[in-house]
Amino acid sequence: MNLSFFDQFMSPVILGIPLIAIAMLDPFTLISWPIQSNGFNNRLITLQSWFLHNFTTIFYQLTSPGHKWALLLTSLMLLLMSLNLLGLLPYTFTPTTQLSLNMGLAVPLWLATVIMASKPTNYALGHLLPEGTPTPLIPVLIIIETISLFIRPLALGVRLTANLTAGHLLIQLIATAAFVLLSIMPTVAILTSIVLFLLTLLEIAVAMIQAYVFVLLLSLYLQENV
């Protein structure tokens, strides 16, 4: 049976249960309960606390209404980061490579920020026209700003999906090349394996950065509207 490189992005079904449903529960199983006190859980709690402490700094620029979103956005960042990192493990499924999931996260949160801004109508419409715009350019700029407003959730979802998909494909391509070259040119295979190791480190960084960028952009959209 020949497998395609894109088969890794298809959600398999086990006993009638989509694997994406199981994969979405993995980050929650990593959260330690207070009754557990072994060394691994203590390190995990310390790591979670460090992330929460450092990532909440992006919310300092928000006004008081925006601070209500801090817990939601921080939890979203930890969820995305956990899914991205767990997806780098062998024989695992990465839910965040699915555009449907990313759009399902991006659209409701973006729409919530737009609804918050629509309460004071004059303030909301003011975002569509920069101050000091010449009169002949007003219709053009309103159209451009409206398009840029509605394209934001698409950019959020596509950016996360494209970066993770490209990284997974590149890792699989280089790993396949290293395996094929192992019996033909061992020296080249070793060099390819070194490149694969470095690329894996890069993808670990990308997995964390993309989760941070996703939430950072949402916080910037929120900052404009509160």
Curated annotation (Swiss-Prot):
Subunit record text: Component of the ATP synthase complex composed at least of ATP5F1A/subunit alpha, ATP5F1B/subunit beta, ATP5MC1/subunit c (homooctomer), MT-ATP6/subunit a, MT-ATP8/subunit 8, ATP5ME/subunit e, ATP5MF/subunit f, ATP5MG/subunit g, ATP5MK/subunit k, ATP5MJ/subunit j, ATP5F1C/subunit gamma, ATP5F1D/subunit delta, ATP5F1E/subunit epsilon, ATP5PF/subunit F6, ATP5PB/subunit b, ATP5PD/subunit d, ATP5PO/subunit OSCP.
Domain of life according to the entry: Eukaryota
One Gene Ontology term of the molecular function aspect: proton channel activity
Role: Subunit a, of the mitochondrial membrane ATP synthase complex (F(1)F(0) ATP synthase or Complex V) that produces ATP from ADP in the presence of a proton gradient across the membrane which is generated by electron transport complexes of the respiratory chain. ATP synthase complex consist of a soluble F(1) head domain - the catalytic core - and a membrane F(1) domain - the membrane proton channel. These two domains are linked by a central stalk rotating inside the F(1) region and a stationary peripheral stalk.
GO biological process, one term: proton transmembrane transport
Keywords recorded for this protein, A-Z: ATP synthesis, CF(0), Hydrogen ion transport, Ion transport, Membrane, Mitochondrion, Mitochondrion inner membrane, Transmembrane, Transmembrane helix, Transport
TM region positions: 13-33, 69-89, 97-117, 138-158, 179-199, 201-221
Enzymatic reactions: H(+)(in) = H(+)(out)
Residue stretches in coiled coil: none
Pfam families: ATP-synt_A
InterPro entries membership: ATP_synth_F0_asu, ATP_synth_F0_asu_AS, ATP_synth_F0_asu_bact/mt, F0_ATP_A_sf
GO cellular component, as recorded: mitochondrial inner membrane; proton-transporting ATP synthase complex
Subcellular location per the Swiss-Prot or TrEMBL entry: Mitochondrion inner membrane
CDD domains given in the database record: ATP-synt_Fo_a_6 (cd00310)
Official protein name in the record: ATP synthase F(0) complex subunit a
Membrane topology: Multi-pass membrane protein
Taxonomic classification: Eukaryota, Metazoa, Chordata, Craniata, Vertebrata
Database matches in Gene3D superfamilies: ATP synthase, F0 complex, subunit A (1.20.120.220)
Principal subcellular localization: mitochondrion
Family note: Belongs to the ATPase A chain family.
